[in-house]
Amino acid sequence: MFRATLAICGRTVVKRQFISSVSGESALPPNLRLPPNLIGVAAEKRPPPSGSDLPVVRRCEADVPAHLTPAQTWLESLGSRDSDQLGVVDLHPDVFSVPIRLDILHAVEVWQRNFKRISYANVKTRAEVRGGGRKPWQQKRTGRARHGSIRSPLWRGGGIIHGPRGPTSYYYMLPMKVRVQGLKIALSAKLAQDYLHIVDSLEIPTPDPQYLQDLVKHRQWGDSVLIVDVGEEFPQNILKATEDLKTVNIIPALGLNVHSLLKHESLVLTLEAVKFLEKKLLWHDVRYTPLYPFKLPYSDLP
């Protein structure tokens, strides 16, 4: 009975795949929602960078381990709506190709939401509620239950026991290595999902927000885009274009964090931002090594 059922199910799957291949329809369930860049036309025409004839515009400045190879992606420009590739960019594998650890991502995300959280919930005890100083009735000869105050927790309008006594801080710290690893994992996940885009600069021809919206829609960058560049001063056109857009945000590379990466669908980095992130994140792997030659426990210095 089990073999017959397995054979029938197998034939059904093969039949569905054959019909979908002939008719051009998708064999996936209709209620399955996939990101548009995985099933769109632009993604189908996107060849792997390894087989490209375009020159390698950027090489990894830091030494790449012998057992690893640099990750590669396209270099694009924001000068036009068309996604013309200008070249190939090498990305350090220790930053953009680390193994995905969802537990670390979750730990960093929860920490980032809670380490500044303060709860101001506060309730009054029976000693703080107004009134209740007089005994409501005598102890005996009334037939009622004995009570000493109308502000007892047993009474309606009385004090609260074991209630919140704010302000309460939820502050705690994660180790620096865990936070750095979480940022590496988030960057690697964006690259693996084809959500990472490298541009030469943030110069756009017009400050019109519609131009940026059309560019994002034409290149199928998703519903939300995070643009990252170094420094605190950005081109005026990109600032004015993103000023009134809720789905396109721009931040400096120094403020890049796991929460912002998970909140936005696509990530756009400039070449200078890639250089800054690689230098900063790789530095954490070897920081204070001369001070700890015997591999002592990690410690931060002031």
Swiss-Prot record:
Alphabetical list of SUPFAM superfamilies matching this protein: Ribosomal protein L4 (SSF52166)
One GO location term (cellular component): mitochondrial large ribosomal subunit
Keyword Ribonucleoprotein appears in the UniProt entry: yes
GO MF entries: structural constituent of ribosome
Subunit structure: Component of the mitochondrial ribosome large subunit (39S) which comprises a 16S rRNA and about 50 distinct proteins.
Primary localization: mitochondrion
Gene: mrpl4
Keyword Repeat found: no
Natural source organism: Danio rerio (Zebrafish)
Compartment(s): Mitochondrion
HAMAP family linked: Ribosomal_uL4_B
Keyword vocabulary terms for this entry: Mitochondrion, Ribonucleoprotein, Ribosomal protein
Name of this chain's protein: Large ribosomal subunit protein uL4m
Membership in a protein family: Belongs to the universal ribosomal protein uL4 family.
Domain of life: Eukaryota
